[in-house]
Amino acid sequence: MEEFNTTVRISGFVLSSLMFHHLNSDADVEGLILGESVGEENCRITDSQIDHIQFEHTLNIQKHIPCHKLHSFYSNVGDVSEQKIRQILSDYKEENVIGWYRQRRNTRQQMTFMEQVIHRNMRKILSNQELVFMLLTPSQGTASGSTHRLEFSAFIWHSSQYINIPISVSNLGNLEQQDYWRVSSTCPSLGQSQAVNQHRAKFFCSGDDLREVRNVSDMNDALLAEMQKVCVEVEKSERTVEKLQEDIAQLKEAIGKQKTHPEEHETPISACPEEPKENTLLCSALRTLFPSVPSLRTQTLTVHGFPVLQLCCNTDHNIDISTKLPQILENQHSRRKVTAPRLRKKCLVASFPQRLKRKRKTREVSESASESGSDTEIEMNGQSGSNSPVF
């Protein structure tokens, strides 16, 4: 029984370089992939099967060469130019080309018809028939645009169709596979032991571990802890922003409904205005304090601002003002006592100038009388002097 498995292996450095180059460009990016193709054949013998052959085909991506623009090595109909590929490769050989890549924004992880035609024409020109097509599709992870997502996949031509093959990132796997970098070997040789003992103090700590590697590992753990804290904070802020955006969307939708259907949201205007509510306690208090003034118990005024006596309140509300508002009655009695002497003083003050006028008139009359009397006396004296004989 035979099995054929194909995988693509790429390092984190090359993948990050692809991402960096794509994010720094405003349009889609494409280019060539350089590397090597390795094939292995494993034969297993089990109780159920005498021979179990498994072919492992691994495509190791080592480098990528980006093109300056789209359609750099093919035409609008998908015809690939070998001369343009050599110009892009420059000092590299065609044997090192194991495929090409394309980066599209906000699209699906699926080959288009144009990409399938280009890939088929490249297989005809290049010597390596097992070409791989790598597709990278970045998109926004959240509505606010603070988190981005990058999906990548690889396709090869197999059995008259394009199939998706798995991609393995070498330094993003299980960290337990790299423990031998920090731990010394269990059975060292004699020469190795002598060399290590000679320089042990410089590179190794007391636990037979590499000092620099342990420090780097501790720093890595601290950075991971800080990154986890930042991730939690970013997640909380993202939830808050999403909630605010939902509220804003609901408000916009409500405003749009009000603009499109204003009749539904308008309050119906009644034909006749509501009658004002009567303050029965105030009406009873005014009736008690001013029983002879009915104009104070009306709520309707004329155009000129005069109360309408026909609409005054004449109903008895059966409210005892002496128990409800006892202070009003006390103030009323005290005012009556205080206002009586004030009226007398006012009358006295009002009659005082009349008396002064009368006194002034009598004085003027007496003065005029005295003046007239003195004049008559002088005249009489003059007459008596003139009639007397002169000797």
From Swiss-Prot:
Q: Which GO terms describe its cellular component?
A: BRCA1-A complex; nucleus
Short name of any one Pfam family annotated for the protein: MPN_2A_DUB_like
Keyword line: Chromatin regulator, Coiled coil, DNA damage, DNA repair, Nucleus, Phosphoprotein
Write out the PTM section of this UniProt entry: Phosphorylation of Ser-388 of the pSXXF motif by ATM or ATR constitutes a specific recognition motif for the BRCT domain of BRCA1.
According to its UniProt entry, the function of this protein is described as: Involved in DNA damage response and double-strand break (DSB) repair. Component of the BRCA1-A complex, acting as a central scaffold protein that assembles the various components of the complex. The BRCA1-A complex specifically recognizes 'Lys-63'-linked ubiquitinated histones H2A and H2AX at DNA lesion sites. This complex also possesses deubiquitinase activity that specifically removes 'Lys-63'-linked ubiquitin on histones H2A and H2AX.
Q: Where is this motif: pSXXF motif?
A: 388-391
Query: Which classification does the entry list for the species?
Result: Eukaryota, Metazoa, Chordata, Craniata, Vertebrata
Gene Ontology molecular function: any one: polyubiquitin modification-dependent protein binding
Q: Bias regions of kind Polar residues — which residues? A: 367-391
The UniProt record lists the MPN domain at 8-156
Q: What are its GO biological-process terms?
A: attachment of spindle microtubules to kinetochore; chromatin organization; double-strand break repair; mitotic G2 DNA damage checkpoint signaling; mitotic spindle assembly; positive regulation of DNA repair; response to ionizing radiation
DNA damage: is it a keyword of this entry? yes
Q: Which protein, by its recorded name, is this?
A: BRCA1-A complex subunit Abraxas 1
Record bears the keyword Glycoprotein: no
Q: Where is this region: Disordered?
A: 354-391
The family assignment reads: Belongs to the FAM175 family. Abraxas subfamily.
Tell me where on the tree of life, at the top rank, the source sits: Eukaryota
Subunit note: Component of the ARISC complex. Component of the BRCA1-A complex. Homodimer.
Tell me where in or outside the cell this protein is found: Nucleus
Q: Which organism is it from?
A: Danio rerio
